[in-house]
Amino acid sequence: MKQMSYVTRWLYSTSHKDIGMTYLGFGMLSAMMGTGMSVMMRMELSNGNSQFFHGNNQAFNVMMSGHALLMMFFFIMPVWMGAFGNFFLPMLMGAADMAFARLNNISFWCLPPALVCMVCSVLMEQGAGTGFTTYPPLSSMSAHSGPSVDLAMFAMHLTSMSSLLGAMNFMVTVLNMRTMGLHMVNMPLFAWAMFLTAMLLLLSLPVLTAAVTLLLMDRNFNTGFYEVGAGGDPVTYEHLFWFFGHPEVYILMMPGFGVMSHMVSTYSKKPMFGEMGMLYAMGSIGFLGFLVWSHHMFVVGLDIDSRAYFTSATMVIAVPTGIKIFSWLATIYGGELRLGVPMLFALGFLFLFTMGGLTGVMTSNASMDVAFHDRIFIYYVSFFLYTLYNMYNNYTNNNTAHKGRHCANASYNNDINNLVSFMDKNEYIKMFWVGLMDGDGSMQVNHWRKKNLQYRLIMKTSNLESNYNMLMLMAKVMGGTVRISKKKDNVMWVVDSKESIKDMMKMFDKYPLLTSRKMCQINFMKKCMKLNYMPAEGGYPREAGTDWYLLNRNYKYNDQLNMINTFNLKLKNKSFMNALPEGHGMHHMVKHSEYFKCWLSGFMEAEGCFSIRLNKSNSFSMGQNDDFYLMEEIKQFFNATNSVRNSYKNFYCLEIYKRIMLNNIITHCSNYPLLGEKKESLMKFLK
């Protein structure tokens, strides 16, 4: 098959990720244009006299109209819905792509001609200086007789078509493309936000299209829908425009609500507080958004009953909005807060969104609007920009990878770069590797003809593609080589370089092994290396290491047995943690809980087992020889009520089957991901 060219890939792409990136690039181009117009307005207003337009007020109005339309229809909507929605929604749903891949491509290619029309409307003749609302009679032939307003209307038609096609695609994807076992109520909040936004688009955009079409007919076909002299009414246009215009505010904000929830949950390391409440709040905001449009029209001559209704309905929206704000604050409260750059933006958004909402209290009051008339635009712009601009900062500084329980089965399709956002990727892999070494690893010291000692670190797993990829990731960070055994039944990670092993010994001091057997192995190896490679420091002859090895190689686990026996005696009279042997790695684990969580994921990859029983119930089990105290600590970490049982000789097993405790395990694996075969087992387990 002929390889697709670079140009063909981007022009004819049906990949949701490629299309998402084209949306992003298009949005950035539009943002630069809109920002340029904003700079021109700022320069003009920087001094009391005319600075830039030399008294040409029409040019200023054209810049303001172009800026608003570009930023809303060509920047915010394509970037938030098109780019982030297309890129992340299929992954969150566990789907291979969007439901209608070619329709997805068409919805994007409606935008470039729309942008051309929009730019031409600014540049041709006197420009479209109508404001972004394009109210008649200011937008009628009597005020703007050139083609500029017509081109702006065509641009809005094309963007509406693009958004409608995208909205249908999003809704069908959410309804029909969810992975097995992912019910609607268990979807991530970002997926719900995109679904509700698509519903708002589908219900509101046809009304805008109708209003704009009637305006075009008035301008070009001599109709009189909005012409007072012909029996029409310009207020009709206002009702139609704002029936779209107010849901449009929530169309622009709703995806940010979903992202904000994921961001706060991730950087607080807690599940979202009141997740169902957040879902109902978003639904309520979307529903109420269709019932309050005339609060933009308080001074056009509404009767007092209508003004009273729209004032009351507008204030009711504050209730679900307050629920969302307090749920975000409750999630942050008591969490392990990490103030990364995205979280700083999230905290800034919380403050600015609250301030912007307070301006909405003033603009919702019909009585105050009469006094604020001619100044209401200032309040409206402050409300609009406080909320949207800072939510966009939030959006662009978040990686959107949700760490919650409900999207674990879908987000596991992402790689380690997306999943581990709260720490350095390499550090996570190192801590994960230590846990994997505790379970599947081996530290070997051998001799060659009783003269030279040879050292090796080996990790052996079953020969599966997922395990091979995991060990290749380990080798990339830790060094070493990955090879497949002669019988093709195992894949191994091996390090036999003395210098590399010395470096790893230092890393084990930072991230200690926690199982008794591996602790004894590393102590034995360190002793041999000290005697063999550091004779000058220790005052030992070079052959001392080999002699000591030959003398003690058959007794290297005696320390482990003594450690366990001592621990069991102490446990009768002391608390669990106080009974631990002196210097044991569990003391480090308590001091560095973040390390233990990462280590535990590696240990679960090696020793854990996700099972589906014959009665269709789920369970998780893991065990370890001799290390009762370690299994007891893991039990306490997951808040498990099951006892650690001695199933065979000194093999201690922990089995968890209650749903609440299983949820704790799933949440842990979402935050600290498994990387190999157990990752696939967990995905099947969730289905």
From Swiss-Prot:
Keyword entries, A-Z: Endonuclease, Hydrolase, Intron homing, Membrane, Mitochondrion, Nuclease, Transmembrane, Transmembrane helix
Gene expressing this chain: aI3
Compartments reported by the entry: Mitochondrion; Membrane
Disulfide-bond pairs as recorded: none
Name used for this protein in its record: Probable intron-encoded endonuclease aI3
Chief location category: mitochondrion
Region annotated COX1 intron 3 encoded, chain positions: 375-687
Keyword RNA-binding assigned: no
EC primary class: hydrolase
